[in-house]
Amino acid sequence: KNVFSFSKDATVWVGKRYYHREENHMLDWKWYQIEGFGTGIEYMDLGPGKLSFAWFSNTDNDFSYEKQLNNNGKVQKKDGLWEGDDSWDGKTVVVTEKYDIEYGLTSWDGAWLNLRGTLLVPEVDDNNYMKLVDQPKFSNGNILAVSLDNYYSLGSCKTVVQYIKGPNAATPFGNGSWIDYWSLVKGNNSNDAHRWQFLNYGDMKIGDFGFAHSLYYTVASGFEGWETSKESDKAFSFVVRPYYKLTDISKITAELGFFTETTKYQNGESENYQGQKATLAYVLSPDAGNWKSRPELRFYVTYLHSNDTQALVESPSQDKKVVMNDGTTYAPRDNQVIFGAQLEAWW
């Protein structure tokens, strides 16, 4: 600090760090996550607000092409050209440069408006010798976000509009911080994809009663690829979590949640996954009236209902059986009751 005479709070930094991460704690989801090795200046005074900008360089050196893909493309080496070689598992190094700029200001009493943008520039390391040819070049990724925090006597609320453009727009419930190398190699070209994400989440407290909520919606399109590749998707999620404080260290809490996700493919087909949950828990923590208080011990029972056949339970039934790679036989179920204990701590 104290590097600039016109801005005493400005900080110049260099090194490895988590940088201005934004998280929806109810979903345990970081919707803005830029991190790694880099440098920058943050909280510089500019007009009525604060300006921050940073540069990061991330290396994805464990990225590899699956062996079966060698039958679909050509594997190139500097001293020769191989075709259809199933015995080779090609690897390459992709360095992603990330340029982040952010400006925040007090929009009115009790409110904070934040404007942020990030440019992701992927670069293939030519010194690694091996790469898959005849594949689309990775395009740049872009993230733009506008968020508004409101703080009031009963609690707080955050509203976000986020736009993601390019190969970092591949998945719902994503944050745009990574380039979707895998899908690009597998034929699902997301270079021209774009995604909108809308979030609203917060908490309030009235006496011994508290309440938290999370609302999320996303829609994306512009994907290209094979007939079975994704063309577009959309998803919606809503969660409410009321609680009642029993003592200084205990409370009863409930949680109701719903999600739906629809994916449309290039061949016109589509599929939808959706589910609901209901949880009731007895909770112990040092300050039961504060939802951030940790460590927190929960004794809970949860009811789940879903049409997602990935939610499988072991069954001796041979009807509609699913055989896993290890030979275990499962039968799909659309509902389940789970109970147990859970300990959560933050540090």
Cite the ranges covered by each PLM segment.
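Outer membrane beta-barrel
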Residues: 1-71, 94-116, 301-309
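Surface-exposed loop and membrane-interface regions of Gram-negative outer-membrane beta-barrel proteins
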Residues: 1-8, 18-31, 64-66, 70-90, ...
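Outer-envelope exported proteins of Gram-negative bacteria
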Residues: 13-15, 214, 241, 253-255, ...
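Outer-membrane beta-barrel "beta-signal"
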Residues: 280, 284-286, 330-347
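C-terminal structured domain segments
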Residues: 269-328
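Tandem-repeat/low-complexity and Cys-motif detector
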Residues: 90-92, 104-106, 230, 330-332
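Detector for outer-membrane/organellar transmembrane beta-barrel domains
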Residues: 99-267, 272-280, 284
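Phosphate/oxyanion-binding active-site loops and adjacent basic polyanion-contact surfaces
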Residues: 30-34, 93, 232, 272-278, ...
